[in-house]
Amino acid sequence: MQKQRLLNVGFGNFVVAERVVSIVNPASAPMRRLREEARDQGRLVDATQGRKTRSIIVTDSNHVILSAIQAETIGQRFIQEENS
């Protein structure tokens, strides 16, 4: 059985690293539309614990995960997971 690596997206929430397609900044209009479409279709996971959304993670299953951690920070964690 293959060991799955987990990516910490903040506040005790984790995502399977192999399923991540992109980690993006939520400020642009296309990302806001992506978030609203995911919410309408039931594909949105809010992992912000009530805090401001600072990054959006898109998975290969087309789920959209909101995180209160900066996209750059999650990207660095992702790279560290890849190297370990």
Swiss-Prot record:
Pfam families: RemA-like. InterPro entries: RemA-like. HAMAP family: RemA (MF_01503). PANTHER family: REGULATORY PROTEIN SSL2874-RELATED, REGULATORY PROTEIN TM_1690-RELATED. Belongs to the RemA family. This is Putative regulatory protein Dde_2720. It comes from Oleidesulfovibrio alaskensis (strain ATCC BAA-1058 / DSM 17464 / G20) (Desulfovibrio alaskensis).
